[in-house]
Amino acid sequence: MSKGILGKKLGMTGLFSSDGRHIPVTVIEAGPCVVTQIKTKDKDGYNALQLGFGPKKERHTNKPETGHFEKSGGAAYVMVKEFAVDNPEEFELGQSLSTELFAVGEKIDVAGVSKGRGFAGVMKRHGFGGGRMTHGGRCKRRPGSIGCSAWPSKVIKGKKLPGHYGVERKTVRNLEIVDIRADQNLILLKGAVPGAKSGMLELKKLKFGGK
């Protein structure tokens, strides 16, 4: 069995549990993902499946990509990722994988690219408290001192300062699957996942045991 699949974030909504609790959920289009390459320990040194998801326009596909995808049916994909697998011999090129890898109540890890927020200050980027909001104050949203002048006479590497915020790979662990709608290739996860609407995601089996 593959350790994960690819998906797309469609947005957030809410569900009510049997006891009347409101549960915020993220709706994810999980597959169908196509097996574009099978890697084995004998040939490649490790066992893995290369999965493709999301159709890619022909005019955006170069010749090496076209030749690679011809082996699995010819269609090109926007997102291509590898997932570890224990038994690669059970899969074949062009095979489709979807929500059947997961079950309701199971907890999974979700990885994606966070929303881009441009150039941000220290309060938004790092959660600084800021200065006193007094009349005439000049340090309301400033970071304060960033180092000493006499020694070491420089800003220490790694100092939290204003800068570009977002567009980073983030992983959220132990998200519970609330519902699976196999006929629509949808998975409803409890809570939020990284990225904006239509962002590509990796849905993976737990790397660490969840409670």
Swiss-Prot record:
Quote the cellular component terms of the Gene Ontology held in the record: cytosolic large ribosomal subunit
Record keywords? Ribonucleoprotein, Ribosomal protein, RNA-binding, rRNA-binding
GO terms for MF? rRNA binding; structural constituent of ribosome
| Pfam family of the protein (one) | Ribosomal_L3
Q: State the superkingdom.
A: Bacteria
What's one GO BP annotation on this UniProt entry?
Answer: translation
Query: What quaternary arrangement does the UniProt entry report?
Result: Part of the 50S ribosomal subunit. Forms a cluster with proteins L14 and L19.
* Function summary: One of the primary rRNA binding proteins, it binds directly near the 3'-end of the 23S rRNA, where it nucleates assembly of the 50S subunit.
Q: PANTHER family per the record? A: 50S RIBOSOMAL PROTEIN L3, LARGE RIBOSOMAL SUBUNIT PROTEIN UL3C
Record's family?
A: Belongs to the universal ribosomal protein uL3 family.
The protein's name is Large ribosomal subunit protein uL3
